[in-house]
């Protein structure tokens, strides 16, 4: 098999190949001509998709799986004591992080890299959608399933690539984008960074990696990104947001059950009159999603998309799996309007607050029930006070036990202590669920006609959200 390297390097073995990020790397490497194999702890849809492309996937992590591999690729989720990693190092096989391989891949194309604490997956999807609509046909590597593709990956024919970066371990600063998008910067992954100054430095480096012909797209609604914009002195920058001073600004926003409707005001250089793209519709609610759309619109305009192409593509956007995704409806015994069930990946307080604000905008005075499964004890501990105050837009809050994600419990950091803190912060209806198995019966007592149940978390709550309609009807 021909490869994009000047000499044979042997198969690339991807540890955790079924993961959303690693499966995308596998796809693009296959398309480029690399020989790829991998392993994961269990079968999954991504594993089966890769097998259908001819990839050998081992189930279980074992030292013998890496025999004959030319390199081993790992993500931040793979521990140093993983048996395949240990075997590779003992055998002198290079062990490469996902970001390093992504940097190698993106070196060969003009690349739009999306970074930020929140909104990366949706923004990446929107950029891909608008560039597709403009006939640019980029290659796409995303951190979530794009409904239009049925996958987190698309092989494009153009010289452009759109990728979601990963700032969790700082390796996103190794990327060399042509366009660097920064959606927001909040304290997250502080176990790696330690201080906000170190986190800021990583984003500074990410933007400084732009070539002289590249540009940064920065959301100045967020104070940390606005401060970053002020530090960008030798790269071209374009700001976006609701901020009155933004170069690409959303105005006249309204929301209904069909999504967000708004105009975009575009201001170029000093002295140039602003112009507008009017009557845009995004089939997603929430100011945060409009901000994500503004980033995509900015990139599309820079790459030559017409106003008409942008409007049509935005209106047809199919969304991303687990981003305010409707997964069912249930008609209460009282009749009337059905109860809507929403599944969302939000697991950080800022994300939860944004999702619930969007839900409230859609629901008006109808009931919103937030169901939260905290993800990781360490995150709950580090952001405990923020978690205690992010549910104000919900009428009722149900908190399930913490999804451990391999972590050891931390004394005093439980879903019960979170509920007590939510109550102390003034919420009138918050309760702890013994388990998510109790959810259907509790929803039946709280949800009247027209209510919305929003299931939030990065753990297995998505399975319960998907089953909730059937269990309510059963």
From Swiss-Prot:
Its EC number(s): 6.3.2.8
UniProt-listed Gene3D superfamilies: Mur ligase, C-terminal domain, Mur-like, catalytic domain, NAD(P)-binding Rossmann-like Domain
Record-level GO BP terms: cell division; cell wall organization; peptidoglycan biosynthetic process; regulation of cell shape
Record's keyword annotation contains Thylakoid: no
Family matches, as Pfam families: Mur_ligase, Mur_ligase_C, Mur_ligase_M
Top-rank EC class of the record's enzyme: ligase
Pathway membership: Cell wall biogenesis; peptidoglycan biosynthesis
The UniProt record lists the keyword Cell wall biogenesis/degradation: yes
Primary localization: cytoplasm
Xref: NCBIfam families: murC
Protein's name according to its UniProt entry: UDP-N-acetylmuramate--L-alanine ligase
